[in-house]
Curated annotation (Swiss-Prot):
Top-level taxon: Bacteria
Alphabetized PANTHER family for the sequence: CHLORIDE CHANNEL PROTEIN (PTHR45711:SF6)
InterPro entries according to UniProt: Cl-channel_ClcA, Cl-channel_core, ClC
Marked site: Mediates proton transfer from the protein to the inner aqueous phase: 203
Record protein name field: H(+)/Cl(-) exchange transporter ClcA
Selectivity filter part_1, short sequence motif: residues: 106-110
CDD domains: EriC (cd01031)
Intramembrane segments: 109-116, 177-189, 193-201, 387-401, 402-404, 405-416, 417-421
Periplasmic side: 70-76, 233-252, 310-329, 377-386
Annotated binding of chloride, by residue: 107, 356-357, 445
Catalysed conversion reaction: 2 chloride(in) + H(+)(out) = 2 chloride(out) + H(+)(in)
Cytoplasmic-side positions: 1-32, 117-123, 167-176, 202-214, 282-287, 439-473
Length: 473
């Protein structure tokens, strides 16, 4: 019987096949691999920058409070020093922004969104130092601002710096790394990697170009930035509120009511922010001296409040555990809420380098706690815990204001480590988002970006008219 024997590959054929395989690998486009490698570099640098920024803010705040200790015996002098220390730090931040990089003012997140749409420039060589040191001044002075805005804008600008240094070309690389830097900045600011990823997918969904390479790059950047954060900090929840009880199913309707309240308040808060921007702009009129002095007055006011009523100023992270634990009376909660709304509007709308995430988390906590205390009194049969409403409220204002409910929910869960409250948080966030959309107003960052682009267009038109007039003469 005749059997077939397999033909053996000759050594020459094997060598030829290996050469063809090597040639194919060498000729293959290396751009995706380069982007992923650059994403790791960007994430590492952003994480280190976020850690340095956080440590710098903490050091300045400690130095400022240490200076007050030496004047504790003289109350009028103590108040004067409290005002001046914060005012000088704030004026330093305002001056840097106004003089050297106006685009570094405010949150910075709308600037990154505009850059992703190719409508705003990314001048990293001036934004990075101004945002970093200007943010140190305003946040170190105790103003009612958050650190996530600076770290997101710093992250986006670091990505552009890496692109320029390594001369990586192409729109895909630029767009992908810009989104990676922004996500890494948010993740490192709050030790919340999943929230950083969702922030890009949800909040920046109109600008983010979703591809397999871009989402992998965002993942890698967020992982590296979070690792850098955790190397220099502990792997614990950023805000320690303890383990709260779960929400029984028969109480979930209360969280929907809470979401409706935030759905009403969110668009109103956005209108207040934009209205305060207009009011403060009329005050300084674009004059750098008036603008810096106005910023100093706002910063000094926050410094005074930080000494007299600490719960009413600053980013609000120290307030959240105290409010969640139920250590404030209803009257005190109302006072803190009103005072923090005012300080947040003044600080953020004035163009100070700083974010609004953290202040909104604090406002949501206070309003949620107040609602929880009322619910505890009205429905004793439910055996409610006011702290669960505080946690649900933390992300609800974000959902209503910037229309990013998933980001708000996951951010709060990662920050507080109370994952058992995910269902009431989803209900609260959904109620807040749906009602905010129904009432009309635009998301806060979108409205701010639209204003920035309108101002940019007006300035370009004015320059073109001036150029035409000079040519005619």
């Amino acid at each position: 019987m005749k059997t077939d024997t397999p033909s053996l590959e000759t050594p020459q054929a094997a060598r030829l096949r290996r050469r063809q395989l090597i040639r194919q690998l060498l000729e293959r486009d290396k751009t995706p691999l380069a982007i992923l490698f650059m994403a790791a570099v960007v994430g590492t640098l952003v994480g280190l920058a976020a850690v340095a920024f956080d440590k710098g803010v903490a050091w300045l705040q400690n130095q400022r409070m240490g200076a007050l200790v030496h004047t504790a015996d003289n109350y009028p002098l103590l108040l004067t020093v409290a005002f001046l220390c914060s005012a000088v730090l704030a004026m330093f931040g305002y001056f840097l922004v106004r003089k050297y990089a106006p685009e570094a003012g405010g949150s910075g997140i709308p600037e990154i969104e505009g850059a992703l749409e190719d409508q705003r420039p990314v001048r990293w060589w001036r934004v990075l130092p101004v945002k970093f040191f200007g943010g140190l001044g305003t946040l170190g002075g105790g103003m009612g601002l958050g650190r996530e805005g600076p770290t997101v804008q710093i992250g986006g600008n670091i990505s552009r710096m890496v692109l320029d240094i390594f001369r990586l070309k192409g729109d895909e690389a630029r767009h992908t790394l810009l989104a990676t830097g922004a996500a890494a900045g948010l993740a490192a600011a709050f030790n919340a990697p999943l929230a950083g990823i969702l922030f890009i997918i949800e909040e920046m969904r109109p600008q983010f170009r979703y591809t397999l390479i871009s989402i992998k790059a965002v993942f890698i950047g967020v992982i590296m930035s979070t690792i850098m954060y955790r190397i220099f900090n502990h792997e614990v929840a950023l805000i320690d509120v303890g383990k709260l009880s779960d929400a029984p199913l028969n109480t979930l309707w209360l969280y929907l009511i809470l979401g409706i309240i935030f759905g009403i308040f969110g668009p109103i808060f956005n209108k207040w922010v934009l209205g305060m921007q207009d009011l403060l702009h009329r005050v300084h009129g674009g004059n750098i001296t008036k603008w810096v002095l106005m910023g100093g007055a706002i910063g000094g006011l926050c410094g005074l409040l930080g000494f007299v009523a600490p719960a009413t100023s600053g980013g609000g992270f120290n307030l959240i555990p105290i409010a969640t634990a139920g250590n404030f009376s209803m009257g005190m909660l109302v006072f803190i809420f009103v005072a923090r709304v005012i300080t947040t509007l003044l600080c953020f709308s004035s163009g100070a380098p700083g974010g609004i995430f953290a202040p909104m988390l604090a406002l949501g906590t206070v309003l949620g706690t107040a609602f929880g205390m009322v619910a505890v009194e009205l429905f004793p049969q439910y055996h409610l815990e006011a702290g669960t409403f505080a946690i649900a409220g933390m992300g609800a204002l974000l959902a209503a204001s910037i229309r990013a409910p998933l980001t708000g929910i996951i951010l709060v869960l990662e920050m507080t480590d109370n994952y058992q409250l995910i269902l009431p948080m989803i209900i609260t966030g959904l109620g807040a988002t749906l009602l905010a959309q129904f009432t009309g107003g635009k998301p806060l960052y979108s409205a701010i970006l639209a204003r920035t682009l309108a101002k940019q267009e007006a300035e370009q038109l004015a320059r073109s008219k001036a150029a035409s007039a000079s040519e005619n003469t």
